[in-house]
Every structure is written in C-alpha cells, then in structure tokens.
C-alpha cells in the first residue's frame, strides 16, 4: 500500500515536472514572456514582466494545491479500503470459528 502511494506521488510529481520543463523550454524563465522579445501580445503570462511572473506563480500554486488535493483524496480512499478489508477479515474469522465449532460438534457426537 505504501509503495503504491509513493509511486503515484512520484508519478504525479514527474508529470508536473515534465509540464513545467516543457513550458519553461518554450518561455525561457516562467513569467518572463514568450521568446526574447518579451511577449507575444497574448495572455498575461506570455506578455512577461511582473504580471507574467505573478501569473506563473499563481499557476504553480494552483497545480501544487491540486496535487495536494489529489493526494488527500487518494489517502482517504485507501483508508476507506483498509477499513472495509478489516471488516471483511473480522467477518470471515467469525465464519471460520463458526465452521470450526460445527466440526467440533460433529466430532463430539
């Protein structure tokens, strides 16, 4: 269980890093603008300058928050699965004891 969550966490982190690298290859430094000219006249981030840097920082914050939400959701899901399986184990152990008592009763007769 712990291995799968760490693999998923590493996978999410790798995907985000790849996205950041792709965008940083295209833009140079995040928020600096498109190419050396300082922006393409499109979005705020492409325009560069202080607003571009702010937009880049907000995007990074957004993705970090989404990653944390996904990890929390996954953790909750695994905890629910563990709780369910523990309940199943208890139920099956009671069934085993019930069958053992039936066998013992048959042997005693």
UniProtKB/Swiss-Prot annotation:
Q: Does the keyword Transit peptide apply?
A: yes
Q: Where in the cell is it found?
A: Mitochondrion
List compositional bias (Basic residues) regions by residue number.
Answer: 99-109
**GO cellular component terms listed in the entry, alphabetical order:** mitochondrion
Q: Which UniProt keywords apply?
A: Coiled coil, Mitochondrion, Transit peptide
Q: Transit peptide, first to last residue?
A: 1-22
Q: Biological process GO terms, please?
A: erythrocyte differentiation; heme biosynthetic process; negative regulation of mitochondrial ATP synthesis coupled proton transport; protein homotetramerization
Residues forming coiled coils: 71-109
Signal sequence residues: none
Q: What is this protein called?
A: ATPase inhibitor, mitochondrial
This protein's species is Xenopus tropicalis (Western clawed frog)
Q: Which gene encodes it?
A: atp5if1
